[in-house]
Every structure is written in C-alpha cells, then in structure tokens.
From Swiss-Prot:
The modification Phenylalanine amide is found at F84. Keywords: Amidation, Disulfide bond, Ion channel impairing toxin, Knottin, Potassium channel impairing toxin, Secreted, Signal, Toxin, Voltage-gated potassium channel impairing toxin, Voltage-gated sodium channel impairing toxin. SUPFAM superfamilies: omega toxin-like (SSF57059). This is Kappa-theraphotoxin-Cg1a 5. InterPro entries: Huwentoxin-1. Negative results: does not show effect on Kv1.1/KCNA1, Kv1.2/KCNA2, Kv1.3/KCNA3, Kv1.4/KCNA4, Kv3.1/KCNC1 (all expressed in oocytes), voltage-gated sodium channels (Nav1) (from DRG neurons), and in a range of voltage-gated calcium channels (expressed in rat DRG neurons). In addition, does not show significant toxic symptoms when injected into mice and into cockroaches. It is found in: Secreted. GO terms for molecular function: ion channel inhibitor activity; potassium channel regulator activity; sodium channel regulator activity; toxin activity. Expressed by the venom gland. The lineage of its organism: Eukaryota, Metazoa, Ecdysozoa, Arthropoda, Chelicerata. Belongs to the neurotoxin 10 (Hwtx-1) family. 28 (Jztx-11) subfamily.
Amino acid sequence: MKVSVLITLAVLGVMFVWTSAAELEERGSDQRDSPAWLKSMERIFQSEERECRKMFGGCSVDSDCCAHLGCKPTLKYCAWDGTFGK
C-alpha cells in the first residue's frame, strides 16, 4: 500500500515537471520579453510627477507627504501627523 502511494506521487511529480517544461517551451518568448515590458512600465510610472504622497506612501522627508501627513522616520512612510484643519 505504501509503495503504491509513493509510486503514484512520484509519477504525478514527474508529470507535473514534464508539463511545466512543455508549457515554458511553448511560451518561452513571452517569458523572455516580460522583464523588458515590466521595465518600460516602471519608467512610465516613475515619469509621472506627483504633487504629494498620500497615506502610507513612501517618503524621505515630511515635504514629500500631503497636508496633515508626516514622514515616519523608522519605516519611511507617510502617516497622519496629528493635526486637523484645511
């Protein structure tokens, strides 16, 4: 009983690896092109100018954050600075 379970699991593992390799071979060009596509998307988003960082946005100084938000020094994110008003 134990041997048949182990053999079944081994066969399923081999089939999984075989089908994964065949799938990667079919769409291999897509995999190679995807890093370039991701880099171009990153450039698009970095080129946008932002007025201020909203809540939980990354920052380096308080002036990066929107009104009533301050840059937390430990984790470098914008959080409420405890002030109210317009």
